[in-house]
A protein has these predicted regions:
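Short acidic/polar segment at the start of the alpha1 helix of CheY-like receiver
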Residues: 6, 10-13
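The feature encodes the CheY-like receiver
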Residues: 14, 55
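Short hydrophobic/Thr-rich beta-strand motif most characteristic of the beta2 strand and flanking loop
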Residues: 25-33, 39-40
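Conserved phosphotransfer cores of two-component systems
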Residues: 41-44, 65-71
Length: 71
């Protein structure tokens, strides 16, 4: 199955995403802030789910940073 990275500032939502996707057989990593992402983690993920309305660095900024890490 897929390696999925979920980034959301809401801990309960991170838990829900993890539980739901793992039940379907996926491997899931969650982070509560975009700043916690590393190049290795971004390369590991087949799919990255981002909250676009996080405080501080929003999902759009995280997406731009991920692109710069993996280019």
């Amino acid at each position: 199955m897929a390696n999925i990275l979920a980034v959301d500032d809401n801990l309960e939502l991170c838990k829900l995403i993890r539980t739901t996707l793992e039940r379907d057989g996926h491997r899931v990593e969650t982070r509560q802030a975009g700043g916690a992402l590393t190049e290795a983690l971004c390369r590991w993920a087949d799919c990255i789910l981002l909250d676009v309305m996080m405080p501080g660095e929003d999902g759009f900024a995280v997406c731009r940073r991920i692109r710069s890490l993996t280019e």
